């Protein structure tokens, strides 16, 4: 199995995992930008955490997030919600991977790629990659059979 290959087995605690991964893999180059240097990854995460809309959309989201690198030989990037930590695999420095892992911190759930996670990821993509990227990912999720809760857009606080 290639180091970045996604495991396709169905996990009964996370039945959408393989669908989410397949959908994301099919549009990876179309969602957000490629982050060329590690400092670009750090700056992207800092910009998200500093954006007032982040807390407006997700009032309980962590603001103090630990970001670290994983070696290229690691199988995948990973989020550790109980530690507010994101580990990004070398070679996976792109906006969608960062937003995917951040979504795990924002929406920790018994079902890691469940409907709330998908809605969170879509909201982050819309805010930080733009509407076209959001529409692309949303339609790709639908085409792959991925279910999502309602996507939060912003609270009334942000409307002033």
Please place each PLM-identified region on the residue numbering.
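Active-site recognition of the HExxH zinc-binding catalytic motif
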Residues: 96-108
């Amino acid at each position: 199995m290639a180091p970045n290959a996604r495991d396709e087995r169905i996990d009964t605690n996370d039945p959408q995992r393989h669908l989410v991964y397949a959908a994301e893999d099919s549009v990876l180059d179309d969602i957000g930008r490629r982050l060329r240097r590690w400092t670009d990854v750090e700056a992207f995460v800092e910009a998200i955490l500093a954006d007032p809309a982040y807390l407006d959309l997700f009032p309980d989201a962590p603001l103090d997030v630990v970001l670290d690198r994983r070696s290229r030989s690691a199988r995948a990037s990973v989020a550790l919600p109980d530690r507010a930590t994101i580990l990004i695999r070398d070679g996976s420095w792109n906006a969608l991977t960062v937003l995917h892992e951040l979504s795990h911190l924002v929406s920790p759930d018994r079902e890691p790629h469940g409907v709330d996670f998908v809605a969170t990821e879509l909201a982050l993509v819309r805010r930080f990659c733009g509407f076209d990227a959001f529409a692309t990912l949303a339609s790709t999720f639908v085409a792959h059979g991925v279910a999502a809760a309602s996507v939060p857009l912003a609270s009334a606080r942000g409307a002033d």
